[in-house]
Amino acid sequence: GNSEVGHMTIGSGRVLYQDLVKIHLAIKNDTLKDNVIVKNTIEKSNNIHLIGLASDGGVHSHIDHIIALAKIAQNKNKKVWLHLITDGRDVAPDCAKIYIEKVINICNENIKIATIGGRYYGMDRDNRWDRVELAYNAIANATPKTKDNILDFIDNSYKNEIFDEFLIPTALDGYDGIKDGDGVIFCNFRSDRARELSSVFAKDDFKEFSVKKLKLNLASMTQYDKNVKI
């Protein structure tokens, strides 16, 4: 973190919760499901896609937020596809399976892991669009695809000395991409590394690489860019 938070809140005379804590509290108090944006996005969408950094590093995201949203969408009788971005920076470089196994524990007929890929690709912030394109293609187009289960995919990547931050964005068998009428919720609460990937889906005039023109319902845990409508 930085000192800005302290400078902004000194003298406010009350507790000002930061985004991580706010979302944690909403989950604990069972009020996240009542959030207007979350509720509307889920209710008006066919399938729900959750995209987020899958760790408990707490800098950009928290795995518990992804899990909570998946359960909320499932309770609305939605099919939920999880797009898990592996960390390797805010946590150890080779501990993704700890978090993936936590997600596997909630998976069932309605909640499935769709894609996996390292933050090097899905969370770029320096306009390296070739990286972002690989993340987008896995999420939107289910390309490339692996027959391996997700834990074997991670193990095989490790054998090739490709660790969590750099896992190649890949779709899992059974996932066929995002469709018209689906909802996409970006689960990271910190904006700087969520801005690029989310803009690919949100900008009508996106031109950095070829994208599918889809009618999607988009939402994010916080505002990433006031000039991009999510």
Region roles according to the model:
Residues 10, 186-187:
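Short hydrophobic-aromatic micro-motifs
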Residues 190:
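Conserved phosphate/oxyanion-binding catalytic-loop motifs
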Residues 1-120, 128-130, 134, 206-230:
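Active-site nucleophile/metal-coordination loop of metallo-enzymes that catalyze phosphate/sulfate
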Residues 182-183:
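Extended acidic, low-complexity intrinsically disordered regions
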Residues 91-179, 194, 202-208, 212:
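Long, well-ordered, tryptophan-enriched scaffold segments
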